[in-house]
A protein has these predicted regions:
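N-terminal nucleophile
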Residues: 2-226
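A short amphipathic alpha-helical interaction element
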Residues: 220-259, 270-275
Length: 275
């Protein structure tokens, strides 16, 4: 087998109600997240793999931005590529349409599957079960897009995965102004570049990401009544702080602090743990 093949399995998907597009990927390849996943809010997502053509990422997004469908985008990318027989690509467009392409010279097992709002594909797999697990898990799960993508990735590995083993994994999710301080479109961008169990490590990082940058719905915040306010002041004093915002900033929880009439239960939990 020639060097340079991005032997992998991936799923590209969207949550139109949330305005999110994303890609999850795992491979026996160093730093797969630097090559395979591409996404842009309002345009779509692309996964480029096998003997990956990295240009499929930006060029695919440009086509999607113009209003091309997922299938039209795949057709245009592969038609212009003399190496298409070795390429594999999955695309989801702005309307949730999906398309996947597997070149005739991709190493077995190789193939893909599409459904409402997702494209799943892989090459050099133990069997087709991996792609089926990606698709069926995505269809069967609910909740945030990032969590559905991670669940699909784990199911793909449990079904066999890349027949060469594991090395790296990545998760990319975009949403307009959904990123840090609402000044970025990158909601989640996590990469495990070299690890014996990259999917488990990616799941661990996602949990940390949600702690630091996740958002508890405001209606689940706890009112700062007299008793709770006194507890918070006491906890802060014990740590040497007067302001919850000051402590949260140093604890990397400032995205979860807003006003002084209520407190995010995650912040309260971490404050109690810090005492």
């Amino acid at each position: 087998m020639a060097d340079g093949v991005v032997a992998t399995y991936s799923i590209v998907a969207c949550d139109l109600a949330a305005g999110q597009w994303g890609v999850a990927v795992q491979s026996k390849f160093l730093a797969v997240g630097s090559v395979v996943p591409w996404a842009e809010p309002g345009a779509g997502g692309v996964a480029t793999q096998s003997y990956a053509n990295p240009r499929y990422g930006p060029e695919g997004l440009a086509l999607l931005r113009q209003g091309r469908s997922a299938q039209e985008t795949v057709d245009a990318l592969t038609a212009a590529d003399d190496g298409r027989a070795q390429r594999q690509v999955g695309v989801v467009d702005a309307k949730g349409g999906a398309a996947t392409f597997t070149g005739a010279e991709c190493h077995d097992w190789a193939g893909g599957r599409t459904g409402a709002g997702y494209a799943a594909q892989g090459n050099i797999l133990v069997s087709a079960d991996t792609v089926d697990a990606l698709a069926e898990t995505f269809e069967a799960t609910s909740g945030p897009l990032a969590e559905r993508l991670l669940a699909s990735l784990a199911a793909g590995q449990a079904a066999g995965g890349d027949r060469r083993g594991q090395q790296s994994a990545a998760l990319l999710v975009v949403e307009r102004d959904g990123g840090y301080a609402m000044l970025s479109d990158t909601l989640v961008d996590l990469r495990i570049d070299d690890h014996e169990r990259p999917i488990e490590e990616l799941q661990r990082l996602y949990e940390a990401h949600e702690l630091l940058f996740g958002k508890t719905p405001r209606d689940r915040w706890l009112p700062l009544d007299e008793e709770l306010r006194a507890e918070v002041r006491g906890l802060l004093a014990g740590l040497g702080y007067e302001s919850l915002a000051d402590w949260a900033g140093l604890a990397n929880l400032k995205e979860r602090v807003d006003g002084d009439d209520a407190i995010d239960p995650v912040v309260l939990r971490e404050l109690r743990r810090a005492k």
